[in-house]
Amino acid sequence: GTSSMVLYTAGSSTSYPSHAPNGIRLHFLGGAREVGNVGCIIEDRSGTRVLIDYGLAPTKPPKYPSEAPPVKHAIMTHAHIDHIGMAPWLTHHGTTLHGTDLTAAVSEIMWADTYKVSDIEGYPLAWDKRDLEAALDSWVPHQFNTWFNVGEWRCRLHPAGHIPGAAMIEIQTPEATILWSGDIDTRNSPNAPKATPVECDILCLEGTYGGRTHPDRAEEEERFVSRVL
């Protein structure tokens, strides 16, 4: 249930498998069959383990992901609350947060707002202000197209479109190259360059608008301006 998220102690009630994977394992904590509430553990037989995103769905009441196992590293694709909303809780594990500098900067605003809204609406939150401060201190920002190491893996971030600072994550493991798309937009916008293909062996792709055709951006901008004026 939703309340169990608030009561659990770090690492004590996670459903994450205790045995080492035979190959590459993707274990979803949320977001696999839903929009938002995202979190996925990727681990291989080397023992390297990383958490991709850790959000909450800002519904009433909020919907929380399953409890994360201890992780040394988490990579945040972008600063929307359904992708980073639970990240301050990870400070119980001493987790290092990776992302773009813009995602790190915007996270402070998003977390402060989440804390304020939960207080106003009276919904319990699994982290407090001390966790928020610790999470801000745990960021390690990265530039696009710059390699960094996570355990035995090499990782780098690529522009994802969507919102400023949003990133796709390329992960080179000894067995395969994984691309985690995060939320993407394949069209340029005034605020963010579009996502472009990255060669990989395993593609983890979001499908929020997979079955929908978006209206033409120029027409939408004209319609917006005419409404305002």
Question: Where are the regions that the model predicts?
Answer:
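Extreme N-terminal basic, low-complexity initiation segments
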Residues: 2-5
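His/Asp/Glu-rich metal-coordinating catalytic cores
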Residues: 7-11, 16-34, 39-75, 80-84, ...
